[in-house]
Amino acid sequence: MTDVTIKTLAAERQTSVERLVQQFADAGIRKSADDSVSAQEKQTLIDHLNQKNSGPDKLTLQRKTRSTLNIPGTGGKSKSVQIEVRKKRTFVKRDPQEAERLAAEEQARREAEESAKREAQQKAEREAAEQAKREAAEQAKREAAEKDKVSNQQDDMTKNAQAEKARREQEAAELKRKAEEEARRKLEEEARRVAEEARRMAEENKWTDNAEPTEDSSDYHVTTSQHARQAEDESDREVEGGRGRGRNAKAARPKKGNKHAESKADREEARAAVRGGKGGKRKGSSLQQGFQKPAQVVNRDVVIGETITVGELANKMAVKGSQVIKAMMKLGAMATINQVIDQETAQLVAEEMGHKVILRRENELEEAVMSDRDTGAAAEPRAPVVTIMGHVDHGKTSLLDYIRSTKVASGEAGGITQHIGAYHVETENGMITFLDTPGHAAFTSMRARGAQATDIVVLVVAADDGVMPQTIEAIQHAKAAQVPVVVAVNKIDKPEADPDRVKNELSQYGILPEEWGGESQFVHVSAKAGTGIDELLDAILLQAEVLELKAVRKGMASGAVIESFLDKGRGPVATVLVREGTLHKGDIVLCGFEYGRVRAMRNELGQEVLEAGPSIPVEILGLSGVPAAGDEVTVVRDEKKAREVALYRQGKFREVKLARQQKSKLENMFANMTEGEVHEVNIVLKADVQGSVEAISDSLLKLSTDEVKVKIIGSGVGGITETDATLAAASNAILVGFNVRADASARKVIEAESLDLRYYSVIYNLIDEVKAAMSGMLSPELKQQIIGLAEVRDVFKSPKFGAIAGCMVTEGVVKRHNPIRVLRDNVVIYEGELESLRRFKDDVNEVRNGMECGIGVKNYNDVRTGDVIEVFEIIEIQRTIA
C-alpha cells in the first residue's frame, strides 16, 4: 500500500486536518499537514482510536434482593422485618497485550515444571543407580571375604555359595527396583505438589488483579507471611534432602505424625477449607504449640522424707491421688488422701508404681548441733554407777540407807520406793553412785531405765524369802543391758534365813556364784545390823576395777534423765546422771523434746553446786518443760539451734504418732462393732514425778477387760489444776492424785461439779480401788440353782389346768411360780413354769421334802408317770476384777 498524505487521509476520514494531526499526536506520532503516512502508522492510529472509543474496561453489576422476615414477639404477636441483600460483582476486560504476557508466563512456568520434573527424575535415577552400585560393591566385598574365609571347605559350600549369590543378586535387584519405585513416586508427588502450587498462585494472581486497592494494602502482611513460610518449607526440604545417604527413598515414604511431610501453608489451607465461608481465606497463622501427650509412663526420682501425706506423694509422682490410694489398697493398706504415712510405706508404694526413691534425712540440723560439741580427748577413771534391784520389801532402800547413814526409807510411803533415788557415796576406796529402783511390778519401766544407765547391778534377795517374780524380772533387765550382777543376800540375821536356797534358786536363772565356777559375787549382808556392808562395797569396787570404767572429764557434758517432775515454785525439775564431760551452771542443754539453760543445780542433799562431773547425779532447773525419764541430755553451744531441734523433735514425734494410727484396719472392725457394749472407766491422773505417771498408767491400762476398759483421759506431772478438773467434768472421769493435791481453783470446780477426787500415796491402794470401781460396772453373772425334785407318781385330768401330776417331793423344796424342767429318763424334754401347786385341794406356795402334792405345768400336758420335775431358781452373782 502506498503512502498517503495527511490531507488525503483527512479527506478519506471526513475530518479536519488539525483534528487528524491531534489524533496522531495522541497516538504518539508527530505529523504535519503535508507529511505522508505509512501503513504501519495508519494501523497505530486505528488501534488508538478503537481503544479510545471502545466500551469501559471494567463492568460492575449490582443486584438487590428484598425479603420479609417474620419474628415472633412477646404476647404472641409476630413482627415483620424488611431485609435487603445487596450483591456487587466487577468484571474486568483484559488487554490483549496483557493476555499475551500472561500466556507467555504460563508457558514459561510449564516449561520450568517440565525441566524440574526431568531434573528430579534424572537425579532419582542417578541416586538409585549409585545405591545399587554401592550395594553390589559391598556385596562383592562380603562375598570375597567369605570366599577367603571358607576356602578350606570350598567343595562343601559351592552350591550354597551359588544359591546365596543368586539370592543376594535378586535382593540387590529388588532393592534397586524399590528405590526406583520410591524415586518415581516421590517425583510424581513432587510434580503434583508443584502443579497445585502453580494453580493456587495463578488463582491468587487472578483475584489480586481484581481486588480493590484497600484490600491489597490490607493483605500485605498475609502475602509476606506466605512467602516466608514457602521459603522456610523450601529450606527444610533442602536440609532433609542433604542428610545422609539413601534418605530420599525414606523421605518419600509417608509417616504417621510427620510434621514436615507437607508445608505449613498446606496445613493451614486444609484447616481453612474445613471452616469454609469467608474464614476459608487464610488471614495469617497463629502461634501453635506442638505438645504431644507422652506415649509411656515417665519414671521419676521421688524424694521422700521420714513422713509424707498421700497427696504429697501423688504430687511428687505426678499422678492422681486416687491412683496412689489404689496402689496402697493392692498392698493391703487403706488410707485417705490427707493421711500421713511413714517412709517405708511411701517407699513401697513409689517403687510399686515404677519410680526411683531417694530417702532424705531430715535430722541434718540435729546432727549438725550434736557434732558441734567440744569434747575432751583424755579419758580418766570414773566412779561406777550401781543400781540396786530386787523384789519389793527385800531391803533395797534399807541397805542403801545404811550405806548413806541416813533414814531414807522412812520418807517413802508405805516403806516402799516409788521413785528412782540417785545418790553418790564417798568411801575409803573411792566414790560410788547408787540408783535405788522400785521393786514392785508396776515400776517395770523405771527398773529397765535404771538398768540401761548403770554399770553394775546389785541384786538384793532376802535370805528368808528367796527368788520372787520381781527378782526374776531384775535378772532379765540386767542380762538385756549386759551388766555384771553382784548378789547381796539380805536379812542374813533372821533365824529362818537360808542363803544356800537363794544360790540354788538363782542358779536356775544363770546367776552362778564364783565358788561354783560362775562370775557373780555373792555377799551376805544385813541392812538392819550392818553386817557385810564393807564386803559389799569392796565387791562393787572390785567389779568396777575389772570393768576399767573411764570417761572424759573435760568438755561439754552428756548424760541421761533419771527422773523428772514439776515443782510449783521451781518449775520443771530433772534428775540427771552425767555420763561424760562436766555440766556447769549456765550451760545450754537439749533434753529430748525440751531445752533450756541450767539456772541451778542441786545434789541429792539439796545443796547448790556449780558443776557436776561424770557419774554424779544432780537436779537441774531451767528446762522449757518436764522431759521424759530416760531422755538423753546433751550440752550444746547455741540456744536458738537447741530450740529448733527440740521443736523439730516434737513435730516429728507427732507425725510419726499420726502415721502409726491406722483408723481403718480390718482387724479393728469387730472391736468397733462391739464398742457400744463396753463400759469405760475414765481417769485423769496426776502424779509428782514422770516415772510414777508411766508406772500407774501402765498398771491401770492392764486392768482392762472385754467388758470394762480403763481409759486415761489425761495425765501429767504436778498438782491438780482447774484445767484437770474441767477435763474430768467434761469426760465424766475420776480425778486421781498420786502424792499431789488440788489447788483452790480446782477444788471449787470439783465441789461445783461433784467430781470424784481421790488421793493416794501407795500404788497398791490406787489399783485396788480402781479394780473395785470396775467390778461395779461388770454385769452380774446369772447362775441356776436347783432347789427341789419331785417324782411323778400318777397323772390326773383337770378341766381348768389340763394334766395334773401327782408327785412326791424327793429332794429340797418345790415352790410355786418357779421355773421347772421336766426330765424323762434323765433327759430334759420340757422347760417352763410351775403354774399350779396344791396339797389336799388347797393351793400352797411350797411343798417340802417327803410330802405329796399336785403340780400343774403351764402350757404342757404330756406329763407321764415316772417323770421327774426339777424346780430351780436363777440367782445373780456379782463379778469382780481378778
UniProtKB/Swiss-Prot annotation:
PANTHER family of this UniProt entry? TR-TYPE G DOMAIN-CONTAINING PROTEIN, TRANSLATION INITIATION FACTOR IF-2-RELATED
Q: What is this protein called?
A: Translation initiation factor IF-2
Positions of region (Disordered)? 28-294
**Chain residue ranges for the region called G3:** 436-439
Which residues does the annotated region (G4) include? Answer: 490-493
Pfam families for this protein: EF-G_D2 (PF22042), GTP_EFTU (PF00009), GTP_EFTU_D2 (PF03144), IF-2 (PF11987), IF2_assoc (PF08364), IF2_N (PF04760)
The entry's family comment says: Belongs to the TRAFAC class translation factor GTPase superfamily. Classic translation factor GTPase family. IF-2 subfamily.
Q: Which classification does the entry list for the species?
A: Bacteria, Pseudomonadati, Pseudomonadota, Gammaproteobacteria, Enterobacterales
Q: Where is this region: G5?
A: 526-528
Question: Which residues lie in Polar residues bias regions?
Answer: 67-81
Q: What does this protein do?
A: One of the essential components for the initiation of protein synthesis. Protects formylmethionyl-tRNA from spontaneous hydrolysis and promotes its binding to the 30S ribosomal subunits. Also involved in the hydrolysis of GTP during the formation of the 70S ribosomal complex.
Provide the gene name from the record.
infB
Q: Where is the composition biased (Basic residues)?
A: 244-258
Occurrences of domain tr-type G (ranges) = 381-550
GO CC, alphabetical = cytosol
Named from the GO MF annotations, one term is: guanosine tetraphosphate binding
Q: Which residues bind GTP?
A: 390-397, 436-440, 490-493
**Where are the annotated segments for G2?**
415-419
User: Where is there biased composition of kind Basic and acidic residues?
Assistant: 92-209, 259-272
Cite the entry's keywords alphabetically.
Acetylation, Cytoplasm, GTP-binding, Initiation factor, Nucleotide-binding, Protein biosynthesis
Q: Which organism is it from?
A: Shigella flexneri serotype 5b (strain 8401)
Keyword Nucleotide-binding (UniProt) = yes
Q: Where is this region: G1?
A: 390-397
According to the record, the segments passing through the membrane are: none
- N6-acetyllysine: modified positions: K800
